[in-house]
Swiss-Prot record:
The gene is HOXA2. Residues 31-46, 55-78 have a biased composition (Polar residues). Residues 23-133, 183-216 are annotated as: Disordered. PROSITE patterns: ANTENNAPEDIA, HOMEOBOX_1, HOMEOBOX_2. GO terms for cellular component: nucleus. Sequence-specific transcription factor which is part of a developmental regulatory system that provides cells with specific positional identities on the anterior-posterior axis. CDD domains: homeodomain (cd00086). InterPro entries: HD (IPR001356), HD_metazoa (IPR020479), Homeobox_Antennapedia_CS (IPR001827), Homeobox_CS (IPR017970), Homeodomain-like_sf (IPR009057). A motif (Antp-type hexapeptide) lies at residues 88-93. The keyword Transcription regulation applies. This is Homeobox protein Hox-A2. Residues 130-189 bind DNA.
Amino acid sequence: MNYEFEREIGFINSQPSLAECLTSFPPVGDTFQSSSIKNSTLSHSTVIPPPFEQTIPSLNPSSHPRQSRPKQSPNGTSPLPAATLPPEYPWMKEKKNSKKNHLPASSGPAASCLSQKETHEIPDNTGGGSRRLRTAYTNTQLLELEKEFHFNKYLCRPRRVEIAALLDLTERQVKVWFQNRRMKHKRQTQCKENQNGDGKFKNLEDSGQTEDDEEKSLFEQGINNVTGALLDREGYTFQSNALTQQQAQNLHNGESQSFPVSPLPSNEKNLKHFHQQSPTVQNCLSTMAQNCAAGLNNDSPEALDVPSLQDFNVFSTESCLQLSDGVSPSLPGSLDSPVDLSADSFDFFTDTLTTIDLQHLNY
């Protein structure tokens, strides 16, 4: 049993010699190296498998504490440093560089996209700056372009090529200049329209205010005219009332004028009526009768009926008002309306006037 165990132990201890056997085939490595370098069909993703010792953990000397002693090859060189130092081969270096280049591209596509955008933006910005410098036109070029824009807002391609060749410009420069000029023209027209609209609106407001002022002035003039007419009317009524009062006082004092009245039988009732109303009317009538009798011819049979034409006087409105004031005692109390006469006084006036006219015609 012990012998068998020792044999097994010896077999186990002899396992590292297998690795030494594997590393003792340099022609295989040389052929693989030469083929990988010469063969251009190998992709970058192909990875050379690690050594056989790393794939099998039982063969790995680091996993066994018993294999602490260094292993020596027949040539006297240690195989482990050779296996753990792959950068010695140039094709390994190429593979690592390719892996480093591919891993960031595969792991961060977003970062690569951003970097590409940045790289694209940078030349664009630099190109934009250079383009802005190229937009400096000479006075002659601007003059010719303005003339052409005055006649044609849009250019056809043949004309654009012709102008570009004439002014020593590129076709793109001419096209961009016309685009910018059209936008400028549009802004100018819009500003003018806005200003005109504001001016029209202000003019409308001013016209509306003037119309309102005219209407107000006309209304005020009408009010002033009406008030003036009312004031004149009130003044006229006040003067007429004062005159009527003064004349009424004169009648009461006996200073009244004589009026030609014919003493006809048809007017006797009216005379009696007035005699009963006021005593002053009797004096007036007696004086009028005396004047009429003095002016008549005594020999004529119509001496008591026909008055003389010299003493004939037409009744005026003031005399009528005087008589009405003397006849009716109610009129002095109501002096606001001087034309407010009684029915009896109107009958008296109409009868006297008609009789006088008839007598004049008969005479």
